């Protein structure tokens, strides 16, 4: 499985900039930020596995409107169905669709994952193509997939 650390790289660069922008925009936030200089709002991401593009999107879809704890539980169940690893797009497509429901995905999220998997398998989506796109192009491309909206696409 290839590795795509792109989302984490962006977060590492964006956090200091975002923190400084918030400090300048709001004196109350400035005091809170100054009182906690080591606070990293996205530190929870450090515990997440680094996945390829498809795996990252599976995680993103799983987390739509759910807590981090619920998302992790669903992903853990999914990985158990696939021998302890995140399935590739081809593995997910080859599996019984009920595996997604048994893992905790809603029917709609299952349809979204299968549509994503089809695009990765047939080449309409790839890690390389997504990495070469601008953020706006990534968002436009991913939101063509039913069930992927701007929130999920921007999180990628």
Labelled PLM ranges:
Residues 62, 134-156:
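Catalytic DNA-binding helix-loop module of base-excision-repair DNA glycosylases/AP lyases
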Residues 1-133, 137:
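N-terminal polyanion-binding entry modules of DNA glycosylases/AP lyases
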């Amino acid at each position: 499985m290839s590795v795509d650390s792109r989302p984490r790289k962006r977060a590492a660069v964006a956090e200091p900039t975002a923190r400084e922008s918030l400090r300048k925009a709001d004196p109350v936030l400035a005091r809170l930020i100054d009182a906690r200089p080591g606070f990293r709002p996205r530190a929870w991401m450090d515990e997440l596995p680094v996945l390829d593009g498809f795996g990252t999107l599976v995680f993103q879809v799983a987390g739509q409107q759910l807590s981090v704890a619920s998302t992790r539980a669903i992903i853990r169940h999914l990985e158990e169905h696939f021998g302890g690893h995140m399935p590739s797009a081809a593995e997910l497509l080859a599996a019984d669709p009920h595996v997604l429901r048994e893992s905790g995905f809603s029917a709609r999220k299952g349809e979204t994952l299968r549509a994503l998997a089809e695009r990765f398998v047939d080449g309409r989506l790839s890690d390389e193509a997504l990495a070469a796109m601008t953020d706006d192009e990534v968002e436009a491309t991913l939101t063509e997939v039913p069930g992927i909206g701007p929130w999920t696409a921007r999180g990628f």
